């Protein structure tokens, strides 16, 4: 099996695992993930955070976003662009749309853009992960291209335990 085939199989297994969670499991897991991240020093110290709007059964960080905003942290969300580029955008009050892949995303023209080197913490959705916490994404490479430019940020993959492959 090639690496590409392995990743495709891991991706499929991870998506199936997160979709198989019951509503109760999902609610508990989302709360536990948010609490665990908020207890980390990297979250406590972060001023600028890139997170994501959950899609397709991904771990939902809404509770974390509410608490981070209450603490005065700046929250940016990814906007997928041409050439598989990613932009960190802080949405305005009416600055949301359904963007690429049907994901809720900030409207760039109504958002403040943060440079990658301005980010302190990047929370990345995982489709699957392995025993040594290597991330498998959706396969387009948006984060793979973006993360190396986040030179001062702590980068954390976010997934449910059920997504371990």
Give the label of every model feature segment:
Residues 2-118:
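N-terminal active-site beta-alpha-beta segment that forms phosphate/nucleotide-binding
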